[in-house]
């Protein structure tokens, strides 16, 4: 064998050995992924959260687990080997685990993420006030209310029933006491949840039928313990949150003169219009 042939054979053998090493490691993706940090943007209950996972040699073949707390996970096309961008829908309130695993199932990173209690802000001509919603104790009611908020249903509805020393009720009528269309199906009554109709609490209005609440809600201007759950024969009204900012504005509603309009009593003569309701947390 001459020198040139021997050199060529050595070169081929070297390439084969290198190829074998790369193949054993998984090719260019052979280095194990590492995570150096996680950042969450827009972690609001019921909305899409964006999770940024930074590190090295990351691939969309890694597995991100949230114990069902953030559903429908999807990696963005903008993800790189140094930064994975994951979107998912936050379905719990409070702390939940985030675990990143390699494609082979090895845990490479763990963390705890937090979704705060949802808050919404109601805007009227006289200013705004904020509600904090208790998803843990009234999950069906909170999801229902946020569904109306998300589709903009409450825009241009009225606080149509205001009784000093009792309640301010809204969310079902437009100017001139016209019933607003587009309500969702009635929900199951969640009044036996440990929450009470105390001052500044917010509850769902309903008919005499227990499971009849749709869009209308009321704010308790005083402690109305008579509206609490007593038993199945006296189920009360489901509290699902409270006013956490701007209660003075709600109290001012009760100072407005009221009368009978289109057969409805206790209607503010100067309309109290809700221009919009936004989820702010």
What are these regions (language model features)?
Residues 1-23:
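Sec-dependent bacterial lipoprotein signal peptides
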């Amino acid at each position: 064998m001459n020198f040139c042939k021997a050199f060529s054979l050595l070169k081929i053998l070297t390439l084969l050995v290198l190829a074998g090493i790369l193949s054993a490691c998984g090719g260019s993706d052979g280095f194990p992924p590492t995570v150096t940090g996680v950042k969450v943007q827009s972690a609001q209950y019921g909305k899409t959260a964006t999770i940024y996972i930074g590190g090295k040699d990351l691939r969309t073949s890694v597995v991100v687990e949230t114990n069902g707390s953030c559903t429908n996970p999807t990696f963005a096309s903008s993800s790189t080997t140094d930064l994975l961008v994951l979107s998912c829908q936050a379905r719990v309130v409070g702390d939940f685990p985030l675990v990143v695993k390699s494609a082979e199932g090895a845990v490479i990173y763990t963390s705890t993420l937090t979704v705060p209690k949802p808050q919404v802000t109601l805007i009227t001509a006289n200013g705004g006030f904020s509600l904090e919603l208790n998803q843990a104790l009234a999950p069906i009611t909170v999801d229902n209310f946020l569904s109306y908020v998300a589709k903009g249903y409450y825009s241009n509805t009225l606080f149509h029933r205001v009784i000093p020393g009792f309640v301010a009720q809204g969310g079902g009528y437009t100017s001139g006491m016209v019933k607003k269309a587009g309500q969702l199906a009635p929900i199951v009554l969640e009044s036996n949840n440990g929450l009470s109709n105390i001052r500044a609490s917010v509850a769902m209005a309903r008919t005499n039928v227990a499971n009849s609440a749709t869009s209308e809600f009321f704010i308790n201007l005083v402690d109305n313990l008579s509206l609490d759950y007593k038993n199945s024969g006296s189920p009360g009204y489901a509290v699902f949150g409270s006013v956490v900012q701007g209660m003075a504005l709600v109290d001012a509603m009760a100072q407005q003169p009221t009368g009978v309009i289109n057969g409805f009593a206790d209607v503010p003569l100067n309309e109290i219009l809700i221009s919009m309701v936004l989820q702010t947390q």
